[in-house]
Structures are given as C-alpha cells and as structure tokens.
C-alpha cells in the first residue's frame, strides 16, 4: 500500500510548515550522506537504496538534489545498470542547466558521455564530453579540462577498437576511417598528458601513457607502444599499483610479439603470470598461461607450450569457461602433434569438437572435424581414406575460415575429396571427362543475347529449324544430381524478371484506390491513362479534404511533441516551493545552450539511424580466461609463413605418407590462418 503524500505548505500553518520541511530536509540529507558513505566503502547496492530513499523523501534544495542525482547515476554505473545511470545523469544535467550551475552542467555532461560510451553510442558521447571540455575551459578549470580531454580520447579509442574488431584486421592494417578515429584518440591523449604533466598529476600521467601505448599498438606502431608502456610500468611501480603493473607487462609482451622478439615477450608474460597469482585473479592467470603457451609455440618449445596450455585448461574448467576450455583443447592438440603424439592430439581434438558443438562455434566445429579426420588417417585406424569421417566443408569459406588449407592436400587425396564436394557445392561435376551431356545452349530457354542479336524473326524460326532438340527430363535427372543448394540466377532469368517488372508496373497503377468517385470512373474507362491524365489526377488529389487530413495529422503530432518535452516539475524528489520556483523559471531561460552546441548535436544525431539497423549475428562470446584481444589469432596471420616452417611432420603410417596429408596443426582456429 502506497504511503500517503506529505502535506504541502499551503495546507499547514506557517510554523508547522517550516518544522515539517526542516525534518524532511534533514532526513533527505542524512539519507544521502549515508548513501555516499556506503558507495565510498564499495557497497554500491546499499548506497543506491539510501539514495533512492532520499529521493522518495524529496528536497527543495536544488543543489542537494543535483548532487543526489549525480551520485545515483555513478552508483548505477558501477553496478553496470547503465540505463538507470543514464536516466539520473540526464536529470542532473537538466537540473544543473535550469539553476544555472555551469560546473554542475560540466560534470553531468562528462558523466553522460562516459555512460553513452559504455552503451556504444559513441557520437553522442563525444558531444557530451566536448560540452564538458568547453565549459571547463570557459571556467578556467584545468583539472576538469584534463579530465574532459581524457574522456574524449577514451571515447575515440573505444570507437576505434570496436571498429577494428568488426573489420577483423591486424594491428597496423586498418581501414582509413578506423585509423583516423585512433589518431584522434591519440591526439586527445597527448593533450591530456601535456596538461597533467603541467598539473603534476603522476597517476593521471600513468593512465595517459597506458592508453597512448594501446592506441599506438592498434595503429601498428609497436616500437612507440613499447616506449609508452615502459613509462606506464615505471609509474605503476612508483605507486605500488600491482594491477596496473600487470597490465603494463601484458601489453609489453603483446607489442614484443609483433616485433618478433618472442623471448622478450615470454619474460614479460612470466611477470604477468607472477603478478596475477599475487592478485589471486584466476582468470588473469589463465590468460597469462594462454599467452605463454602460444609464445613458446612460436619459439618451437612445444613441451613448455603444452605445459602452459594444460594450466590454462585446468583453470578454465574450474571457472566453467567453455570458450577458453575449447581453445585450450585446440592448442593442446596442435602441441601434441608437433611433439609426435597423434593419439593424445586426437583426444583433445575430439574434446574440442564436443565443446564447439555445445557453444555453437561453427568455425571451431569445422576445424575440429578436419583435425579428427586427418589424425585418424595418420594413425591408420581406418582402412581407407573414403571411410574416414569426412569433414563437412560446405560453407567453410563462408564461415570465415581460410579455404587455402585444402590446397595443401596431395593430388591423390584431392581426387578423393573433390568429386563429392563439387557435387554438393555446384550441383554438377567438373572433372569427369567421359561425360558428354548437352550444353547449356541446348536448353529451351530464351537467351537474352540471341534475342537482341538475331531479332524476333529469328526467334520465331528457331523451333522449326530443329537444330537443337529439347532435353528430356529423365536425362536431366540421370546426368545432373539434384541438390538443395540454390543456383545463382542466370542472364535468362534476369531478362524474364526485367520484362515482368516492366509490364507489371502499369498494372499496379490500375489497382490503386481512387480518392473520389469521378476518379474511379475515369480509372474504369481507361486502363492505361496518359501522362496528361495522370498529371490531372495528381492535381485533383490536392483537394480541401486532403488539406484537412494533413491538418488533422499536424494537430495530433503537435500534442505528441508536447508530451516528449522535458519538464523540471516532473523530476523525482523535487518539491517546488515559493523559494525555488523563481530559480526554476528565471534562471532556466538564461542558460539555453548556444547554436554551436545544437549544430554539433545535429551533426552527431545524424548517425543515430545506424542504431535502428538490424545487428549482425552475435559473435562467439569471450571467455573470462581468454585475453581481451586474442592476439595469437592475429599472430598466426602475420606469422603464417613462419608457422609453416615450424611444423613437424608426423612419423606416421604408410597411408599418411602415400596421401601426403597435412598436419592437424595446420587447421587453425576461427579467425586464424
């Protein structure tokens, strides 16, 4: 049952009203202070409960209410309830603008920008962060200016990182728009670094160095990236920040991998592993083991690689990370193949297949099936290659895997696999030399080129010439196996659809409903009206009735626009009294944003139409034991030639030597080659 609303000031005598409001103000402030204390202690859920209670009590102090909104938004942000955080930061921004609090408006704009960035609405976030920067510069707030510069760089950085993931490109090989976005991020980070150096803020300098290193890493400037990460590492050690130190070592390892210094990278990853154990972070420990296993693979030390991949597998199983567990099984299979243990490799390949099927990883499933087939053939467990478990390669290239792997098969093996695969993919055979069926020109279909080259008379004469007899349907069934894969439309079908569209276009006009009876009669009298008649009809439709209809739409839409306007009086927790109503009316009009702000807002709002597009299919979820950037899949594309030189042939069966089958290690994970 809802509690009764508190009495308003007009219903109570003067002294009673003042005492009631005094108690309510004290209660609201006490609740807010307790919520702030709990949030500082890290108990955000309890802090949110106290802040919400303070809003329920309400206050007439606009600055107090603005502070409560800001704290509530920040608390919801840390709880990852970003929609609620966005709501309260919007309330804070509206209230700050209404009462003319420029510093409050700047902080609210910055908080909005950070929340929009996490939601992936980068262009809107840039508008808000730029507003924060403008006000900070206007007020001479150097600390706020530095924070705004960092936030803008962070938004551009996040946007560029997401675009680089979508492009699936290696660091340094990015599309121009992604490079431009990352360059913008680097510029703002440089400005932030210069300002925080002037302010003497070492902690902020460390953050700037770390983000500059990450940005240059994505741009492919690996030497510059190592320079910035070394600066980040030094500041982290200065402050005793173990988490930042671990991140710096990990980033240094990634950069040295792309510089080809694998031994140096391994040392940095070992430091990462040591710090992750000190921090008691199992997920990060598994990531370090995964990176070390891949690095020792590049160093051709397969026994150590298998050791670290086994550690990764154990932690992934403890944390129920099926994605990481599957990747560990795949890596272990490759390592055991390189060590000459195909039986153990087959065990992990089957486990990889099982996990890929569970999590819906189509690429992983295809890779595992191919590995299992090749390992079974190598072990000589099957009597012939035709009896092996044939990998389902249909759609392999469409799933993003490299089709070049099939080119490594020997000629004999390729002859075994090509016939069924070609039939599945194309619906016809391409390599049976003894088959002599009728050509495509034998089919009784109208050919567009002949139609336009020979003319209609030749087309009419063609059936009587008897140069080509129609193909019997029974022959088609015998010679061309039926397939469920759709055939691409030919030029004949395109011609047919062009003609169909041309003649159907006029029929559509005949089926339209006329607005007036006179027009209906005219439509019945003439099936295909002339251009003049259509122009006259279009002029008739602009009748007074039509104008009344549009007037009705305009009036209804105007009411909907009014419903969408922001109202200060609807803010939760706000009690409007004679003391603050003047601030809400007078000061609110004086703080209208300038034209530059609205021009910038319109510019970035134009991209909101992208938010309405259908999203692409979800990618494979990232497991907690996998690094944020699975750098080894990138390494394999960069080091493709090196990897081939490092492969070890199986000392296998005669079947393998005769067929020339490649190692299962050549089958790469999704996104790798």
Curated annotation (Swiss-Prot):
An example Gene Ontology CC term for this record: plasma membrane
Record's comment on post-translational modification: Phosphorylation regulates interaction with G(i/o) alpha.
Residue ranges with Basic and acidic residues bias: 420-439, 451-467
Tissue localization of expression: Expressed in neural progenitor cells (at protein level).
Keyword Protein biosynthesis attributed: no
Principal location class: cytoplasm
Subcellular location: Cytoplasm, Cytosol; Endoplasmic reticulum membrane; Golgi apparatus membrane; Cell membrane
Span list, region Interaction with STK11/LKB1: 361-485
GO molecular function: GTPase regulator activity
Region (Disordered): 420-475, 508-531, 644-673
Protein name, UniProt field: G-protein-signaling modulator 1
Example GO biological process: nervous system development
Keyword Nucleus part of the UniProt annotation: no
Domain GoLoco positions: 493-515, 546-568, 594-616, 628-650
Subunit structure, interactors included: Interacts with GNAI1 and GNAI2 preferentially in their GDP-bound state. May also interact with GNAO1. Interacts with INSC/inscuteable and FRMPD1. Interacts with GNAI3. Interacts with STK11/LKB1 and MACF1.
Record membrane topology: Peripheral membrane protein
Biased composition (Polar residues): 664-673
Keywords, ordered alphabetically: Cell membrane, Cytoplasm, Developmental protein, Differentiation, Endoplasmic reticulum, Golgi apparatus, Membrane, Methylation, Neurogenesis, Phosphoprotein, Repeat, TPR repeat
Modified-residue entries (Omega-N-methylarginine), positions: 418
Function comment: Guanine nucleotide dissociation inhibitor (GDI) which functions as a receptor-independent activator of heterotrimeric G-protein signaling. Keeps G(i/o) alpha subunit in its GDP-bound form thus uncoupling heterotrimeric G-proteins signaling from G protein-coupled receptors. Controls spindle orientation and asymmetric cell fate of cerebral cortical progenitors. May also be involved in macroautophagy in intestinal cells. May play a role in drug addiction.
Alphabetical list of SMART domains matching this protein: GoLoco, TPR
Annotated domain remarks: The GoLoco domains are essential for the GDI activity toward G(i/o) alpha. The GoLoco domains mediate interaction with G(i/o) alpha.
């Amino acid at each position: 049952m809802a509690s009764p609303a508190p009495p308003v000031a007009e219903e109570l005598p003067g002294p009673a009203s003042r005492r009631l409001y005094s108690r309510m103000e004290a209660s609201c402030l006490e609740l807010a202070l307790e919520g702030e204390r709990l949030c500082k202690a890290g108990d955000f859920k309890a802090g949110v409960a106290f802040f919400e209670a303070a809003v329920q009590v309400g206050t007439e102090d606009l600055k107090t209410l603005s502070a409560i909104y800001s704290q509530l938004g920040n608390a919801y942000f840390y709880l990852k309830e970003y929609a609620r955080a966005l709501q309260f930061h919007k309330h804070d921004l509206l209230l700050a603008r209404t009462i003319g609090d420029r510093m409050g408006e700047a902080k609210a704009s910055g908080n909005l920008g950070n929340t929009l960035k996490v939601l992936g609405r980068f262009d809107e976030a840039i508008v808000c962060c730029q507003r924060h920067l403008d006000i900070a510069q206007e007020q001479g707030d150097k600390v706020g200016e530095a924070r705004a510069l960092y936030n803008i760089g962070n938004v551009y950085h996040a946007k560029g990182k997401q675009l680089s993931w979508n492009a699936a490109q290696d660091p340094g090989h990015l599309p121009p728009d992604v490079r431009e976005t990352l360059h913008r991020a680097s510029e703002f980070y440089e400005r932030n670094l210069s300002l925080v150096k002037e302010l003497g803020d070492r902690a902020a300098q460390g953050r700037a160095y770390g983000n500059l290193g990450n940005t240059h890493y994505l741009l492919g400037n690996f030497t510059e990236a190592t320079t910035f990460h070394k600066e980040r590492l030094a500041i982290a050690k200065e402050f005793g920040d173990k988490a930042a130190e671990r991140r710096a070592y990990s980033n240094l390892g990634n950069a040295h991998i792309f510089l080809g210094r694998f031994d140096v990278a391994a040392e940095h990853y070992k430091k990462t592993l040591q710090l992750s154990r000190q921090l008691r972070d199992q997920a990060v420990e598994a990531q370090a083991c995964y990176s070390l296993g891949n690095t020792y693979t590049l160093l051709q030390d397969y026994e150590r690689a298998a050791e670290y991949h086994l550690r990764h597998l154990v932690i992934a199983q403890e944390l129920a990370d099926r994605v990481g567990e599957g990747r560990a099984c795949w890596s272990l299979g490759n390592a055991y193949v390189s060590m000459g243990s195909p039986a153990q490799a087959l065990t992990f390949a089957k486990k990889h297949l099982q996990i890929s099927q569970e999590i819906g990883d189509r690429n992983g499933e295809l890779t595992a099936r191919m590995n299992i087939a090749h390992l079974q053939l190598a072990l000589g467990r099957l009597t012939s290659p035709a009896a092996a478990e044939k990998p389902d390669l249909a759609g392999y290239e469409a799933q993003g895997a490299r089709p070049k792997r099939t080119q490594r098969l020997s000629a004999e093996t390729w002859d075994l696999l090509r016939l069924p695969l070609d039939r599945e993919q194309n619906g016809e055979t391409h390599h049976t030399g003894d088959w002599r069926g009728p050509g495509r020109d034998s089919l009784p279909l109208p050919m567009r080129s002949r139609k336009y080259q020979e003319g209609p008379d030749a087309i009419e004469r063609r059936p009587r010439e008897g140069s080509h007899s129609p193909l019997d349907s029974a022959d088609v069934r015998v010679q061309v196996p039926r397939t469920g894969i759709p055939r691409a439309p030919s030029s004949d079908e395109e011609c047919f659809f062009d003609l169909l569209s041309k003649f159907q276009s006029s029929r559509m006009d005949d089926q339209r409903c006329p607005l007036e009876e006179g027009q209906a009669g005219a439509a019945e009298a003439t099936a295909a009206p002339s251009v003049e008649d259509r122009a006259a009809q279009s002029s008739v439709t602009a009748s007074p009735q039509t104008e009344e209809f549009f007037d009705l739409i305009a009036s209804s839409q105007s009411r909907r626009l009014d419903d969408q306007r922001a109202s200060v009086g609807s803010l939760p927790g706000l009690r409007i009294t004679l003391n603050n109503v003047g601030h809400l009316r007078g000061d609110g009009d004086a703080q209208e944003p300038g034209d530059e702000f609205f021009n910038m807002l319109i510019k970035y709002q134009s991209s909101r139409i992208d938010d309405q597009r259908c999203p692409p299919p979800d990618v494979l979820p990232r497991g907690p034991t996998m690094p944020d950037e699975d750098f080894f899949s990138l390494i394999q594309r960069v080091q493709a030639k090196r990897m081939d030189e490092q492969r070890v042939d199986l000392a296998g069966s005669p079947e393998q030597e005769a067929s020339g089958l490649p190692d299962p290690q050549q089958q790469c994970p999704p996104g790798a080659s």
